[in-house]
């Protein structure tokens, strides 16, 4: 190593702060540049956690953690490993939303991200190379921030989403933080608030679209694959008009994943499989109502559709299990303004004697009698008592997932769903929910959090050197997550808790890697999936550094 003392102390992948040993300080030219006491990482973590707890708000806590992240990746992840449940909502959803909104005011450090500008496509390769800085990149999370967390278009501010996502990957699954790269594709913004803000740090023009936009995406993917051929490319929070198009183009060519389309769908499918493990029913007997037919809602529907086809149904047979409801009501094949994703799940008016009346959720529930109802509408309180009781009157164990977040946008509260169904509902929410006490039973509420799925999934794909991610591997991951449910316990959650995320992420990674190997989709020869995962796992402990 030929770096200077200053370069080492300012490199978050190398810096240990006061944990550099006396021998390291001498060898690296650090003698006298740090206080004399040599601390252990546990002592540093105790000190850092006390500072974290002293912050007066969750945003202040996030700023503190991000500063620690900028200074010392190993200590940051060591601390997060000890407090993963407490830190998850702070480094990611929901507090990251506050950070995005105030990104211009709070900006201090690019955090090793790559900022690709639509106005300079000729610089894409150099941008990625500079940001990687010689590191062996195995995972790239890229966003154009057009569809942030139900917040909409936030331009270059959305890079915090990519950074936060990668934090969860490392904390949950053990992906080496020096092998990841967050990327912002700055295609402009249609957010007038940002365009009018003199502090805005991104391209100050409306979003580009069409051929110019897709040309930049193509150039980016080509450069990313050339520079990082062993990487997984994770697309995050793209607008719904572009997300599916991009995924469809590349999913059969490279190892890629769209968390909003596939990740949400996978977690919801895993939750449904967990619920069906409890109710002892078959997925082939379910009627599925999707309330909210945007990117997330249709991504969920597509994932369940694939599972029904894996279970032996034809595509047309599987589609008969779905009812998509949006602001227009039930979506029919003659509904105007449908997206390509929505068109795949429309119904025919001839199926209903009262088709013209199916313009709201309650009317559709009465007509269809769904057994599964999934909310991604961001319309608060729309799963009303009368709607839920109508649904519960026609199925013994209604599966109800109000997934919209944050809390103020949720379709219903878990405690209400348990009460309105007399404890029969199998519930998952989009945000953490407290246990519900009802008639002597403690009902644990699963959280439909994508973080339950994508870290283990991604790690398994990387460890197995997967060429692509296909339906069979997606299904294997969903069954693995849904199979963790304790079916013998009254009130059991349909999904495992975030508190155990490191345990089941490891299991998921092993299942995914095995699926890839079984299908001969691995680029490199791998004899043992478990060993491949174990060999790649990074642990947040200091390693010896020498000249």
UniProtKB/Swiss-Prot annotation:
Positions that bind NAD(+): 293-296, 405, 450
EC number: 4.1.1.101
SMART domains, sorted: malic, Malic_M
UniProt keyword NAD present: yes
Quaternary organization: Homodimer.
Record PANTHER family: MALIC ENZYME-RELATED, NAD-DEPENDENT MALIC ENZYME, MITOCHONDRIAL
Functional summary from the UniProt entry: Involved in the malolactic fermentation (MLF) of wine, which results in a natural decrease in acidity and favorable changes in wine flavors. Catalyzes the decarboxylation of L-malate to L-lactate.
UniProt protein name: Malolactic enzyme
Organism: Lactiplantibacillus plantarum (strain ATCC BAA-793 / NCIMB 8826 / WCFS1)
